[in-house]
């Protein structure tokens, strides 16, 4: 923010020249777009342009959990009894999950939060990133409890070409936006002499395009790329093997559904005109969006082939997983206004038994035995009426 000296006093200018950690200018955030509006000042959560982001923040906080709440004593002995092909499936998926959440443990805060111009969305993203860190800690907790030497997992992630190939496709859009945004920050484009110029307007438009691609890629990451590994974790749980790990992954899946909704809300608000530039960009980028969905689906299919190269599991095989990925992809495309492209009925979930692991509410467990994952911390019911408890007597 810019300052000028008047006598012995320092006065704050009535405009903001660049990014600042605390904007002292009056900003009417309910009239700003989600990104690239004026920098934020007071963190206030009482007046929202989009209340849905505040609800998502509250829900994420209500779902707070720690991996240490789930016992993995049985998992360690279970792992020793797994056949070699089962160990391959379990360990390979664990490595991939570590990579994905290493990206998401940094991405939203590095890429999106600095350019966010709504307090409710900024707060939502901060909690999102924090929960992704919980996920990364959870994978470490699993690895330390299941393997005698955690290094045999961690130290081989970056030497696995299949994981590196997928990492590149996941991180490219993030990196493109972050690097371009930093160049924009360090340029003169935001200064008065350049604002509104052809060069400045063209630069910001292309920067917004990169932001769109980054958010769209994260939408696909949260909505598709986790689900092959999730399904495998749940399959072990269905077989009463590695149940603690399956329960932790179920908690992670519940969180990832919240993060998926965040990206869907952002994309749909762009599509519906939150920012006129982003509405136009969404339309221009539809062919790219379809192609990116297709690439992700194909990569997940190849991953399923790799997982089951030495044999399948009871209740799960390569063909079922590939059908499941197509079914999930259709749902994700429809949710952001795209037409489903895969020939599979929406009601025909190829792996219906995964649903109760993902939704949490379908799981009935004794509290003393395991983490009750349908429990919400700090939940408040606000639609209670005078006669709500009229039928109760003490």
What are the residue ranges of the model-derived segments?
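Non-heme di-metal
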Residues: 16-394
């Amino acid at each position: 923010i810019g300052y000028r000296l008047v006598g012995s006093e320092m006065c704050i200018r009535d405009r903001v020249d660049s990014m600042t950690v605390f904007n002292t200018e009056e900003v009417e955030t309910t009239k700003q777009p989600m990104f690239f509006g004026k920098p934020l000042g007071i963190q206030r959560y009482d007046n929202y342009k989009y209340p849905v982001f505040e609800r998502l923040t509250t829900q994420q906080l209500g779902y707070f959990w720690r991996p240490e709440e789930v016992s993995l004593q049985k998992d360690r002995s279970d792992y020793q009894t797994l056949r070699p092909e089962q160990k391959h499936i379990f360990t390979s998926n664990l490595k991939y999950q570590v990579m994905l959440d290493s990206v998401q443990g940094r991405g939203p805060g590095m890429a999106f939060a600095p350019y966010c111009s709504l307090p409710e969305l900024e707060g939502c993203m901060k909690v999102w990133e924090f929960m992704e860190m919980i996920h990364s800690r959870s994978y470490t907790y699993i690895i330390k409890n299941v393997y005698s030497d955690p290094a045999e997992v961690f130290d081989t992630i970056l030497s696995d070409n299949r994981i590196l190939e997928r990492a590149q496709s996941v991180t490219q859009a993030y990196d493109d936006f972050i690097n371009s945004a930093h160049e924009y920050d360090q340029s003169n484009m935001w200064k008065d002499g350049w604002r509104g110029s052809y060069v400045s307007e063209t630069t910001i438009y292309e920067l917004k395009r990169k932001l769109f691609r980054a958010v769209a890629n994260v939408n696909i990451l949260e909505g598709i790329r986790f689900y092959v590994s999730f399904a495998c974790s749940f399959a072990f749980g269905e077989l009463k093997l590695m149940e603690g790990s399956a329960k932790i992954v179920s908690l992670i899946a519940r969180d990832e559904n919240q993060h998926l909704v965040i990206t869907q809300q952002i994309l749909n608000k762009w599509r519906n005109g939150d920012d006129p530039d982003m509405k136009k960009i969404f339309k221009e980028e539809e062919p790219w969006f379809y192609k990116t969905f297709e690439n992700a689906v194909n990569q997940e299919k190849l991953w399923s082939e790799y997982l089951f190269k030495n044999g399948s599991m009871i209740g799960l095989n390569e063909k079922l997983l590939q059908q499941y990925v197509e079914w999930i992809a259709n749902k994700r495309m429809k949710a952001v206004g795209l037409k489903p492209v895969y020939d599979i009925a929406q009601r025909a979930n190829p792996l219906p038994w995964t649903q109760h692991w993902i939704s949490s509410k379908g799981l009935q467990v004794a509290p003393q035995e395991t983490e009750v994952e349908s429990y919400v911390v700090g939940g408040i019911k606000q639609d209670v009426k005078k006669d709500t408890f009229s039928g109760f007597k003490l």
